[in-house]
Structures are given as structure tokens and as C-alpha cells.
Amino acid sequence: MPRTPHLLAIQSHVVFGHAGNAAAVFPMQRIGINVWPLNTVQFSNHTQYGQWTGQVLPPEQIPALVDGIAGIGELGNCDAVLSGYLGSAAQGRAILDVVARIKQANPRALYLCDPVMGHPEKGCIVAPEVSDFLLEEAAAVADYLCPNQLELDSFCDRQPNSLADCVEMARSLLARGPRAILVKHLNYPGKAGDTFEMLLVAADQAWHLQRPLLAFPRQPVGVGDLASGLFLSRLLLGDDLRNAFEFAGAAVHEVLLETQACGSYELELVRAQDRIAHPRVRFDAVRL
């Protein structure tokens, strides 16, 4: 029987709704990943509601929790680390220390950094120190970097005028160290208004994926967290870059279809769980 991959997911959590680990953990489990959730913050709900309560995990607690895992002899079984929303730059540095420790225990372990700075329609949602940390430190350590358009623009200190510019910008990030760049949400002049577009760029390949853009009164939160988690999960399950990319795009679309059908603001992960595991429609990525 094939071994089930293990993934340490270090990002935010909400008690109500779906964002961060609350958006990513169940879908990753549903497709066959043993997930170890480590929550950088625990909030009552995601911040787009405009009010919330909760706490940020003290940075020193991150290595302390990993010490506990090492103490029971399981650290070498970790196949990947995923990091997302950070409450502080100190948390980020603690995560990079954890990544180094896990890679020492398992040299084949992967690190995917979802560099959460904001969303193009919402503006920057993290402290400036976190953005600086992501730009200057995390990108150099990540095997996979998964920015949205705003975050890609911040990394490259420019805005694109075309899809070709987006490819060039993503490719420039490869020089910092990542194996591949997944741009979870493209936005550039001339982009078709009725499509949602994603981009995957590695040293020897670039893939562009389009799917229908679904309309919502308020855009659901957690879509990027879901996409990053599914992409990394499919890589751990043996997919190549293109297939992991196409699977993530299709599974996220299934969740959004169910969310739209229910008239929900929060992602309908439970109702869509079978279609997350087995998307009904795949969108072919086009090689650029």
C-alpha cells in the first residue's frame, strides 16, 4: 500500500467559516494527505467581515510545537511544509527555522510559501514588516511560491501590461530560488473580463489556465489558500507540475460552483467534498 504523505500546514485559522487552514486542511485530507495543522493566528472569523476577535500565536510557540513532534520521532516523516498568513515577521522567521529543521530530517521535503500580502480588490492586509520578510527572506527558501497578482507585483516592483509581462515577472522570481511560481490569480490589461486566469512558471515551462469567472455579491475568502494546498498536495501524491496545476484549478472551480449555487459567502467545502476529490470538469492548461 502506498505511503500517505504528511504535510505541516502553518497558517491562519478561523473558528467560523473558511480561511487559511480552515479552508485548506479538510480538502487536503479529502484527497489523501495527512495534514498537521499549526495555526499562526486563531480568529473568530476572517477579517473581511470587518470585525473579529482572537489571538496571534507567539513566535516562540512555533518551534516549541515542532519540538514536540521531534520528541515523538515523527519529524522525519514530514514530506512538505506549507506556510500562509503570518501574524508577524518573527513568526515567518520561526517558520523558516522549522523548514530548515524538517529538510535536515527529510532532505526530500518540500516547502511551499503562499506569500499572503493581500488581494487585488482588497489591498494589503498584513503589516509592512511581513511583506518585507516575504520579499526579502521567504522567497529565497521556498521550493514553490504562490503569489496572487498583487503579491507578484510587489515581488517584482512593477505592474504587468500583458500576459507576457506576467510570465516574465514570474520567471524573474525563479532566480531567487524557487523551482516554480504559481500565480493563483492573474490580472493584467487586456485580460478577458469573463475568465479567471492562473499561471505556472518553471525554468523549462510555463502554463496558462483559464476557467469561467463566477459572479458573487461578495467574493468568498480562502480561495487562494485552497488552491495552494491542493496544488502542493497533488505534487506529494505524484502529479507533475501541469497536472497538479490543472487539478487545483478544477477542484477550486467545483467549490466555487457549489458556493455560488448555495448563495453562500463562505466556501461550501463539505458540500463540494466529492467534487474536490473528483472534479467533473478539467480545464486544460496551455503551454506558453
Swiss-Prot record:
Q: Where does substrate bind?
A: 12, 47-48, 225
Q: Which cofactor does it need?
A: Mg(2+)
Involved pathway(s): Cofactor metabolism; pyridoxal 5'-phosphate salvage; pyridoxal 5'-phosphate from pyridoxal: step 1/1
**Residues noted as binding ATP in the record, renumbered to the chain:** 114, 151, 184, 211-214
Q: Name one Pfam family in it.
A: Phos_pyr_kin
What EC class does the entry list?
transferase
Q: Name one GO molecular function term.
A: pyridoxal kinase activity
Q: Name one GO cellular component term.
A: cytosol
SUPFAM superfamilies reported for this sequence: Ribokinase-like (SSF53613)
Please give the InterPro entries that the UniProt record associates with this protein.
Answer: PM/HMP-P_kinase-1, PyrdxlKinase, Pyridoxal_kinase_PdxY, Ribokinase-like
Q: Which EC number(s) does the record attach to this protein?
A: 2.7.1.35
A Gene Ontology BP annotation from the UniProt entry: pyridoxal 5'-phosphate salvage
Q: Which reaction does it catalyse?
A: pyridoxal + ATP = pyridoxal 5'-phosphate + ADP + H(+)
Q: Which UniProt keywords apply?
A: ATP-binding, Kinase, Magnesium, Nucleotide-binding, Transferase
Q: What does this protein do?
A: Pyridoxal kinase involved in the salvage pathway of pyridoxal 5'-phosphate (PLP). Catalyzes the phosphorylation of pyridoxal to PLP.
Q: How does it assemble?
A: Homodimer.
Q: Please state which protein family the record places this protein in.
A: Belongs to the pyridoxine kinase family. PdxY subfamily.
Stated name of the protein: Pyridoxal kinase PdxY
Q: Tell me the organism.
A: Pseudomonas aeruginosa (strain UCBPP-PA14)
